[in-house]
Amino acid sequence: MGVRAQQKEKTRRSLVEAAFSQLSAERSFASLSLREVAREAGIAPTSFYRHFRDVDELGLTMVDESGLMLRQLMRQARQRIAKGGSVIRTSVSTFMEFIGNNPNAFRLLLRERSGTSAAFRAAVAREIQHFIAELADYLELENHMPRAFTEAQAEAMVTIVFSAGAEALDVGVEQRRQLEERLVLQLRMISKGAYYWYRREQEKTAIIPGNVKDE
């Protein structure tokens, strides 16, 4: 990558970070203006268009980055789990760390999931579907259940996780700890329920797999 290309990528990165920094519990992406973002990034408003067609393209890039960031962290958590440790507790702790370190990224996903822009809703839906698919892959590999079961389990887990994440955004340390404990319990209940439901179905044909991986 040449010097000019590197500088362009650096400025593009500055615009994304500037937009994230202006989000808050009181301020959504829809309220941001091109001028504000450009000023925060230290460039002229007209220079914005060298990097993004419009503010919406910037927002869609932010959605993609938020989803990717979360998925990468969860992959790292699964790698740690492979070395020993609780599957669910490690995953929940990693998720809560993500919210604590990147609250505006998670806020963006939550808000745009049900926002007024069809393009943003579709982008968030894709990111959530990627998240569900990766979790279903992991569950299928670890628990040896059919894809239909692991997808249903993964979807239920992700739904509960995102709901807990929304609660965790603006609470204190102790309340977040309590939320984390509740979430661990709920996910364990889903995990055990999914396995025993599958085992009941398999008992009809006397095909019972090994027990589900203990969390």
From Swiss-Prot:
Keyword DNA-binding: yes
GO molecular function, one term: DNA binding
Alphabetized PROSITE patterns for the sequence: HTH_TETR_2
Keywords from the UniProt entry: Cytoplasm, DNA-binding, Fatty acid biosynthesis, Fatty acid metabolism, Lipid biosynthesis, Lipid metabolism, Repressor, Transcription, Transcription regulation
Subcellular location: Cytoplasm
Listed GO CC annotations: cytoplasm
Role this protein plays: Represses the transcription of fabB, involved in unsaturated fatty acid (UFA) biosynthesis. By controlling UFA production, FabR directly influences the physical properties of the membrane bilayer.
Name of this protein: HTH-type transcriptional repressor FabR
Organism classification: Bacteria, Pseudomonadati, Pseudomonadota, Gammaproteobacteria, Enterobacterales
Gene name tied to this protein: fabR
